[in-house]
Amino acid sequence: MQDKVLTDLIKTEKPEQIEDFLPNEEDITSPTITRNLYVESYGCQMNIADSEVVVSILRPHGFEITDTYEKADVIFINTCAIRDKAEQTVRKRLSQFNQLKRRNPDLVIGVLGCMAERLKQTLLEEEKLVDLVAGPDAYRDLPRLLATVDSGHKAINTFLSREETYADISPIRLNSNGVSAFISIMRGCDNMCSFCVVPFTRGRERSRDPYSIVKEATELFEQGYREVTLLGQNVDSYKWSPNTDKKEQPTTPQEGVVNFAQLLAMVAQIHPDLRIRFSTSHPKDITDQVLYTIKAYDNICKYIHLPVQSGSSRVLKLMNRTYDRAWYLQKIEDIRRIVGEDCGISSDMIAGFCTETEEDHQDTLSLMEHIKYEFSYMFYYSERPGTLAARKYADDVPLAVKKRRLQEIIDKQRQHSFEKNLKDIGKVYQVLVEGPSKKSDIEWQGRNSANKVVVFPNVDCKKGTYVDVLITNCTTGTLLGEICTR
């Protein structure tokens, strides 16, 4: 039933604009001048990775990246639709380009990503300065869409694919520190959490060929990168087989199937100096096999982002999270038993979901007290049009109550983060040096295996090297220390 709902609700027809104004092939593939492209990314890490794919697709067509929008011939905003606030941020940003567009009518402004996919044609109607709209699976079509705009027409493609993974595209790294990079391993989500718009903006789950992933990670290591983060809306459900790209899927077990635990091991074996992270995990899919793989390889970071969303079993059922409070707590115990007590665990939490009571809220606070996350991403509920929650449940928790509950969650998380950091004082951690700290060039920073930021004096440090740091102090969000030798 869940598959049918997702199939019914995801629109896959190509928009009329693409067929009405198809430019000639030579207009697309034979650039005569160089154009400056400016890309701004909002939302999750996946959007950052997607923006790097976009730049790679457009470079052969005469586009060069610029880091200032004032110099741009084309501005792309890669958007998020997970909350209303994210979309309002994009609309506000677009309004700031009005004067720029008036001064330069030839400036092309495009909206990419999840907001583009959700609003489709409506976005062109509501935001008059927008020339181009492209969903997450339409980036290969950007040269054609831009040629359509150049011919004097608006352009839109929000086609959702069942196959697209951009596996053959080598991303051009944007704003890179030269140490850490993202690798997209799968796209889409089949989970259908009742509050979430992602299945409708990114489509069905598709796993990328593992050998292309290993190739990309190997090339990054050879270029000097020392950390890769494997990305997906739900990385633990990664599953690839030789039949993945075929329309007819096998009904019996196949040889050559690669699951997420096996992929982790494949990437970890590239080189012991290449750190591996991954995000994001759904609790139902993080198996013991994954946990034992993390334990087996020193270069797979001992850190798991495991969103709980609520500590109330009743609310979790309404959210369609497929687990309850007791099951989630058992999964946390499994992580600490198998990977180790030092494994960093973070979470996502939503305050004020539909019908949430004070008792439900207290269940969330008590779960936090029991687990004591290293850190969390915390928000109050924002109803998203088209989701199951929007269609089935009343958004009946007053905004003031949502904000108060959220603040209580934030306060508790700050307390726990500080307590956990205090316990690290006196310990020595291996830290991957990322470069100068945000506050001072005298101090440098990096992260330990548990994903904690560590700041230390720069004593002839080099980016991309590992140093041992003795933790001497801390703040709520940062460990402070001195470089030492063991």
Swiss-Prot record:
Main localization of the protein described in the UniProt heading: cytoplasm
Enzyme Commission designation: 2.8.4.3
Pfam families, per the entry: Radical_SAM, TRAM, UPF0004
Keyword Iron-sulfur assigned: yes
Domain Radical SAM core: 175-419
Family annotation (SUPFAM superfamilies): Radical SAM enzymes
Residue ranges constituting the MTTase N-terminal domain according to the UniProt record: 35-151
Cross-referenced SMART domains: Elp3 (SM00729)
Location within or outside the cell: Cytoplasm
A GO molecular-function annotation: N6-isopentenyladenosine methylthiotransferase activity
One GO CC annotation: cytosol
Co-factor(s): [4Fe-4S] cluster
Segments forming domain TRAM: 422-485
Residues where [4Fe-4S] cluster 2 binds: 189, 193, 196
Protein task: Catalyzes the methylthiolation of N6-(dimethylallyl)adenosine (i(6)A), leading to the formation of 2-methylthio-N6-(dimethylallyl)adenosine (ms(2)i(6)A) at position 37 in tRNAs that read codons beginning with uridine.
Subunit note: Monomer.
Protein name: tRNA-2-methylthio-N(6)-dimethylallyladenosine synthase
Organism: Amoebophilus asiaticus (strain 5a2)
Gene of this entry: miaB
